[in-house]
A protein has these predicted regions:
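A short hydrophobic/aromatic micro-motif that marks alpha-helical segments and, especially, helix-coil
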Residues: 38, 101-103, 130
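Short, conserved sequence motifs enriched in acidic/basic residues, glycine, and aromatics
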Residues: 83-84, 113
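Short amphipathic alpha helix immediately N-terminal
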Residues: 85-103
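N-terminal interaction/assembly modules
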Residues: 1-82, 107, 136
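DNA-recognition helix of helix-turn-helix
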Residues: 112-135
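Short alpha-helical segments used as structural interaction elements across diverse proteins
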Residues: 26-27, 72, 93, 113, ...
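Helix-turn-helix DNA-binding module
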Residues: 100-117
């Protein structure tokens, strides 16, 4: 198994900060898609003979939208990684990338009573699992 470079570690670390806002991003995108725009294909014509199925149309838009798929894939990948982590690594994950958390790795080391090097090894483990989950390692 190859090892992640420092640049990759930093990139994945930054990327995981998006996890705290992923539900909001999905909800906003869904609202954008369901906001009505002019979909009248019968401009200037007479009677429109098709039954309007607004709910079905919205769900189809959601299921075909690339942005929503990307957000959901990211969320599912992170959730699978979290399922693989033990309690301590999950706690570290929440301290670093959880909602409302802005801890540095040094602050996390202090909070979990571990050396900085030990905390960085645990970070590397979490980020390596994430890289494997998304197919980058």
């Amino acid at each position: 198994m190859s090892k992640l470079s420092n640049a990759q570690l930093k990139a994945f670390d930054e990327w995981l900060f998006d996890y705290r806002d992923i539900e909001r991003k999905i909800a906003i995108r869904k609202l954008e898609l369901q906001t009505p725009v002019s979909t009248d294909i019968n401009v200037g014509g007479g009677k429109f003979n098709l039954v309007a199925k607004e709910t079905e149309d919205i769900v189809i838009k959601w299921s075909k939208d690339g942005k929503i798929k990307s957000y959901e894939n990211f969320r599912e990948s992170v959730d699978r990684v979290k399922a693989l982590l033990d309690d301590e690594l999950n706690y570290i994950f929440d301290l670093r990338w959880g909602t409302g958390s802005n801890n540095t790795w040094e602050e996390i080391a202090y909070k979990i009573h571990t050396s900085r090097a030990g905390t960085y090894r645990k970070r590397d483990r979490i980020l390596t699992l994430f890289a494997q989950q998304i197919g980058k390692l």
